Regions:
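Bacterial N-terminal signal peptides that target proteins for export
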Residues: 7-22
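Non-catalytic architectural context of zinc metalloproteases
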Residues: 37-98, 126-129, 192, 197-206, ...
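Auxiliary, metal-adjacent structural segments of Zn-dependent hydrolase domains
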Residues: 84-144
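Secreted/luminal cysteine- and crosslink-motif detector
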Residues: 14-16, 32, 90, 128
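Active-site-flanking segments in enzyme catalytic domains
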Residues: 120-275
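Residue-identity detector for glycine
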Residues: 6-8, 33, 37
Length: 275
């Protein structure tokens, strides 16, 4: 789940408000970061993301790969409320951020270099809870600053965090290229609840009605596409098995649509062989 309603406006608020309200704080970070234990790399990242107190976290075994993609993972030690307080990114400890960073990094490294360049992602900020207003959300895409704030919460489920990371990255791609509201998709696919009902907050494959990968995909069209994107990167064989087992022609068409859209936006082919 991500902030959707008025996303373009909200993103502009976020970027402009941060630049206006955090300017002096970022200068303070640059001047006093060393005294607070921040490394020069932390200080630079805080300046570029406009998040005072930001710290970078290393991920053993994949740091080199992330470096070749140009992505850094960070966290904040104190709650921050960017966008004039409209958004919330909760604080994390070093230990918790290091634990969460491993599956997040594993998900990021599934993307090829060209896709990351097209997406323009440079920073992923791990949050101990993320909100838009009072509503919990999975992530906060901020394309103008080339960053994604990601709620890693209290979950220790590595598979879940990988799926959430790729789900939110797809939201960022659609926001970046102004295709979150996809009229062509809307003409071809229907049946959405247009709400986050509790009984739809299930991500297991096969938990949804025909035409949907899972129950969560039934909430909104953009959530449907993001669920497919993540699943096609993480478990393409399982998606293919579900389509074959159910002979679901609608789900098959959705996979092909997301495959074509992903190739157009990110130069990334997703459809499994044999579809």
């Amino acid at each position: 789940m991500t902030e959707v309603a008025g996303m373009g406006r909200s993103t502009r608020w976020l970027c402009n408000s941060l630049r206006h309200l955090l300017y002096l704080a970022v200068i303070a970070v640059a001047c006093h970061g060393a005294a607070r234990g921040q490394s020069p790399a932390d200080v630079q990242a805080a300046r570029e993301t406009e998040l005072p107190g930001l710290r970078l976290v290393g991920v053993r075994d994949v740091d080199y790969h992330l470096g070749t993609l140009g992505i850094r993972i960070g966290y904040v030690e104190q709650d921050v409320r960017p966008g004039s307080g409209h958004y919330f990114c909760g604080a994390l400890t070093l230990d918790r951020s290091a634990t969460a960073a491993e599956p997040v990094a594993a998900a990021l490294t599934r993307l090829p270099y060209l896709s990351v360049r097209k997406l323009g992602l440079r920073y992923v900020i791990l949050c101990g809870g993320a909100k838009a207003g009072d509503r919990p959300i999975g992530g906060i895409p901020v394309p103008p600053l080339d960053l994604l704030m990601l709620d890693v919460g209290a979950s220790g489920n590595a598979a879940f965090l990988q799926a959430v990371t790729l789900h939110e990255l797809y939201h960022m791609a659609e926001v970046r290229f102004n295709t979150l509201y996809d009229a062509d998709w809307g003409r071809e696919f229907t049946g959405y609840s247009n709400g986050y009902a509790p009984d739809l907050l299930k991500g297991a494959m096969g938990s949804g009605k025909p035409g949907f990968l899972n129950a969560y995909a039934e909430t909104f069209p953009h959530e449907d596409r993001a669920e497919l994107f993540a699943a096609l990167l993480l478990k393409p064989g399982d998606v293919l098995t579900q389509i074959r087992a159910t002979r679901d022609s609608v789900l098959r068409r959705k996979v092909l649509y997301v495959d074509q859209k992903s190739e157009r936006l990110l130069a990334l082919k997703l459809a499994p062989d044999g579809l």
